[in-house]
Every structure is written in C-alpha cells, then in structure tokens.
UniProtKB/Swiss-Prot annotation:
Signal peptide: none annotated. Belongs to the TRAFAC class TrmE-Era-EngA-EngB-Septin-like GTPase superfamily. TrmE GTPase family. Gene3D superfamilies: P-loop containing nucleotide triphosphate hydrolases, Probable tRNA modification gtpase trme, domain 1, tRNA modification GTPase MnmE domain 2. Keywords: Cytoplasm, GTP-binding, Hydrolase, Magnesium, Metal-binding, Nucleotide-binding, Potassium, tRNA processing. Mg(2+) binds at residues 229, 250. Exhibits a very high intrinsic GTPase hydrolysis rate. Involved in the addition of a carboxymethylaminomethyl (cmnm) group at the wobble position (U34) of certain tRNAs, forming tRNA-cmnm(5)s(2)U34. It comes from Legionella pneumophila (strain Corby). This is tRNA modification GTPase MnmE. K(+) binds at residues 225, 244, 246, 249. Its EC number is 3.6.-.-.
C-alpha cells in the first residue's frame, strides 16, 4: 500500500459558504503546520487558524480539524481544513499542500485507504458512493443501512455457516475410518439446503436494492398512433413528446426519468414499429429495436380499437427479445369505449389521454419486475447479484455431487469456491482490478 500523503477538495465544485480540503497520510500533520503557521493542533478538536501561503502571506482563515490515526476515516492521520468556499482559495490550499509534500488524491482514494486499513469493508465503501448519488429518500436510507453494515452482516453470517459446513465435510473426508458416515447422516444435506435457502433470501433482498440504486429501463413500443407519446407524457407529468394525429410523429428515441415509488424509472419512447420506406423513420425503428433488446421491461401499447395490432407485434417481440425481458400489454384509449380501467398480471386497460388506469399500470410494473420493499432492505449492486448467483450455482453443484455421487471431495471444493465468491462481496477476497474499478467511480475527495 502507498504511504504517500494525499490531498483533495472534499466539497462539490463551485462557490459556497464553506469548502473542505482533506489531507490523509503520514505527513498530514506536518503539512497542516506548514499551512497554519505552526499552530499546534489537538486530536479531534477544531482549531481556528489563519492559513498561509509559502511566503507567509495569509490566504484565508478557517477551522482545522486533526484526526490522529488510526482513529480516523482512513485509519491514517487526517487533516480537514474548513475554509471559505472560494474555488480560488481551495485551489491555493491544494497547491500549498502539494508544495509541502502531498500529492493529489485519485478518485475514491480516501475510501480505498479506509478499506485497505480495515476501517470499512467493500460493501460499506460502495455504500458511501451510493449514499452520495442516491436519487430518492428511500435509496439514501437503504445506502445508509449498507454503510452501517446491514448487508455485510448478512454476508458474514452466511460465510460463518459455510465455514462450519466446510469443516464438517472436510473432517468426514479426513477421517473416513469413523463408524459414523458424516457425509450421509443427513446433517450435511440439511445444512447445505439451509445455506442455499438463506442465500436465496439475501439475493432477493439484494435485487430490491439494485432496483432502488440503478432503476429500471422501461421501453414503450407499439404501432404508430397507439398512444405511446401520450403515455410517456402522462407518466412524466409534463409534455416531453410531441403528440399529433399523424402516424410516425415520433422518429427518434425520447427519454424521460421519473421516480416510481422511489424506483428510478428510465422511460424510453420509441418510433412506431411498422414497415416504412422513409429513411429517417426506418432509422428510428432500427434504434427502437436496439432499445427494446436492452430493456428491463417493455410496455406494448395497443389501440383498443385495433386489437389485431397486438397479436402480430407481441409474437414478433417474443421471438426477437430475450425471454428474461417481461412484456406488459397496455390496451390504450379506453376513453373511446365503455370499458373501465383494469389490470391483471401482464395486461393493463387504460386511457393515456385522461390518466385513467395509470395507477394500475404502475402497480403491474412493480409486480412484473419483482419490487417488494421489505423492512430489512439495503442498497446493492449488480456485482453483488452476480456473486450471489455464482455462489448458489456452486452450492447446487456440490449438492448434486453429494446426492448423486457421494463425492465428498468434489463437494468440499464447491463449498470452498462458494465461500471465496461470497468473500469477494465484502472484499475479504478480491483482486486489484476489482478495487480499481470500484474506487475509480468515486468522487475525488471521498
């Protein structure tokens, strides 16, 4: 690990009442003395100081806080300077700190040092960035839960059960002369099944956290004049798409971002799907299919007065799109009929024009993508889901080895690999490439 002393501005760019410069590393205290004219600092106390340039010219006044390692965020000596929030003043403080022996921090390097010094685990480090970037109050609360260790505790408890099972299995392999066949006495099978069930429960909770963090890509598709643009306008609560009676009005991709019960919803309106000789419209249709293949969920909007549109297009979507992408059929323009709004598992009847049935649509979207907020919810990332899925696959393989082949050695190896995979979530076992990828996405100064 680097023993450089690092410095960065910890507050957002721009002018403000207060700006914070953060310094961390073995020379942090000495650099602070260079900046404040050798005024002694007491740990965990704020000291009002004049702040000087190298020629002893005062450049500002502010508070200087000293956190002596290891009792600091990074585990190192940390200095935080609270100066006036002028970009010029803050830049001068950075330059003076570098002149005194610091270097500019990389994005996320303060959090990386906290992780490497065992102040936080990898889940908590990611939660810092997620809390900063939270798009709703629920997402912020869930990120805080992850930062406080809720998600980490679940993974650590799962690992403890897995370690116990590994010890049990490996003892049975190492002492085959024992009268009791530990591998086949039922305990191993029961313990393994319990761990798989617990993993599935955590995976379900993590999936809710991913939805809250990353949101949902919702693509609106249909024939021309089915009411797609009217629907996106109604969902957005404002006019974001041009609506006319002329078929083919929407030719390019239209994007809008809203919150659906705290889920970030990335709505994409597309050109009407049909055969066309118009070069511009053909390009719009091509882009529509590209967006459909990347969607998390598709709304197929059908003019209820032309229900035959639905069958051919729905079949085409099912043949073209991956099976994992759910399709909700939206029968629009019920205001032109005697029908009222209603819904079932994958079908909604509504009027995009009047808004009748919009609540039913939102309900179906949440059901289809599996959003079920729970008390123990926490924020998570896709890499966590991938690791949980990989660990489950290994455990199921091990279960098969035990049940079908009585292969204790193969089961032990699958348990070891599953344990290693779960340790990657918290960072107990990880690679430099993964750390670089995670921390490089952080703000400088965090």
């Amino acid at each position: 690990m680097s023993i450089d002393t690092i410095v960065a501005i910890a507050t957002p760019p721009g002018r403000g009442g207060v700006g914070i410069v953060r310094i961390s590393g073995p020379n942090a205290y000495a650099i602070a003395l260079c900046l404040n004219g050798n005024k002694a600092l007491q740990p965990r106390l704020a000291t009002f100081c004049s702040l000087y340039k190298g020629n002893n010219e005062v450049l500002d006044q502010g508070l200087v806080l000293y956190f002596k390692g290891p009792h600091s965020f990074t585990g190192e000596d940390v200095i935080e300077i609270q100066a006036h929030g002028s970009p010029v003043v803050l830049d001068l403080l950075i330059k003076e700190s570098i002149a005194a022996g610091a270097r500019l921090a990389r994005p996320g390097e303060f959090s990386e040092r906290a992780f490497l010094n065992d102040k936080i685990d990898l889940i908590q480090a990611e939660a810092i960035a997620d809390l900063i970037q939270a798009s709703s109050d629920t997402a912020a609360r869930m990120a805080l839960k992850s930062l406080q260790g809720d998600f980490s505790k679940k993974i650590n408890q799962l690992n403890e059960e897995l370690i116990y099972l590994r010890m049990y299995v490996e003892a049975a392999i190492d002492f085959p002369e024992e009268e009791i066949d530990f591998l086949n006495d039922g305990n191993v099978s029961q313990l393994l099944q319990r761990i798989i069930g617990r993993l599935e429960e955590i995976r379900s909770q993590a999936n809710q956290g991913v939805l809250l963090r990353e949101g949902l890509s919702l693509v609106i598709a249909g024939r021309p004049n089915a009411g797609k643009s009217t629907l996106i306008n109604n969902l957005a609560g404002r006019d974001v798409a041009i609506v006319t009676e002329i078929a083919g009005t929407t030719r390019d991709i239209m994007r809008e971002h809203i919150l659906l019960d705290d889920i970030p919803l990335h709505i994409i309106d597309t050109a009407g799907l049909r055969d066309s000789d118009d070069l511009v419209e053909k390009e719009g249709i091509k882009r529509a299919w590209q967006e459909l293949k990347r969607a998390d969920c598709v709304l197929l909007v059908v003019d209820i007065n032309n229900p035959d549109q639905q069958n051919s297009l729905l079949n085409e979507l099912r043949l073209t799109l991956p099976n994992k992408i759910p399709i909700i059929t939206v029968y629009n323009k019920i205001d032109t009929t005697k029908l009222t709004a209603k819904c079932d598992e994958h079908t909604v009847y509504l009027s995009a024009k009047t808004g009748e049935g919009l609540d039913e649509l939102k309900k179906v979207i949440k059901q289809v993508v599996g959003y079920q907020p729970t008390e123990g919810q926490f924020l998570a990332r896709r890499r966590h889901l991938q690791a949980l899925d990989e660990a489950k696959a290994l455990l199921l393989t091990g279960q098969s080895q035990l049940t079908n082949h009585k292969a204790g050695e193969l089961l032990a190896e699958d348990l070891r690999l599953a344990h290693q995979t779960l340790c990657e979530i918290t960072g107990e076992f990880t690679s430099d490439d993964l750390l670089g990828k995670i921390f490089s996405s952080f703000c400088i100064g965090k």
